[in-house]
Design a protein with these regions (language model features):
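Alpha-helical residues within the helix-turn-helix
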Residues: 34, 51-52
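Conserved segment of winged-helix/HTH DNA-binding domains
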Residues: 72-97, 108-118
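Beta-hairpin "wing" of winged helix-turn-helix
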Residues: 54-69
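A short alpha-helical element within helix-turn-helix/winged-helix DNA-binding domains
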Residues: 27-37
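C-terminal regulatory/oligomerization modules of transcriptional regulators
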Residues: 97-161
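Short coil turns linking two alpha-helices in DNA-binding domains
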Residues: 39-42
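Short amphipathic alpha-helical interface segments
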Residues: 12-23
Length: 161
């Protein structure tokens, strides 16, 4: 199974959460931990890493906290993964040459490179704005389904009088 590690998943959740909030409101590690239900030490670690990679900007002081370093539409999922996991690739050898003893005789290396490039390209085309747009659409759909499932207070079940 190909998947992100848990910290990267949490990092994407944090970045999407920060992107949904007003830009002028800095987020503290504690407020983000409370709002996302993630452990405070994990949130602190992720905020530091994301700041070091200039995806978040940090502000010290009484009104300090974290904000996006750029607009949500210019931060890609690929950048977040790169900041938290390193280079994106399908296999280790498709990212760093010379790691595998079979590299020169490998029958699938070129295909691994093609898959890695396609994966990276796809992730470079999904932004925080895209993630939040999809989330807002899902929340609206859920709300509409919930409203549709509620029967009016004056309705009588069929066959009961």
């Amino acid at each position: 199974m190909f998947r992100l590690n848990k910290l990267t998943d949490y990092g994407i959740v944090l970045m999407a959460h920060v992107a949904r909030s007003p830009e002028e409101t800095p987020h503290t590690a504690r407020s983000l931990a409370n709002e996302t239900k993630l452990p405070l030490p994990t949130v602190g670690k992720l905020l530091r890493q994301l700041s070091e990679h200039r995806l978040l900007s940090s502000h010290r002081g009484v009104n300090g906290g974290y904000n996006l370093a750029r607009e949500a539409r210019s931060i890609t999922v690929a950048e977040i993964i790169l900041a938290l996991e390193g280079p994106i690739g399908f296999t280790e050898c498709s990212v760093v040459k010379g790691l595998c003893n079979m590299e020169h005789s490998c029958a699938i290396m070129s295909n691994s490179q093609i898959i890695g490039d396609a994966l990276r390209d796809a992730l470079e085309h999904v932004t925080l704005s895209d993630l939040n747009h999809e989330m807002a659409h899902h929340e609206r759909k859920h709300d509409q389904e919930l409203v549709a499932s509620i029967k009016p207070a004056g309705s009588v079940a069929e066959g009961v009088r």
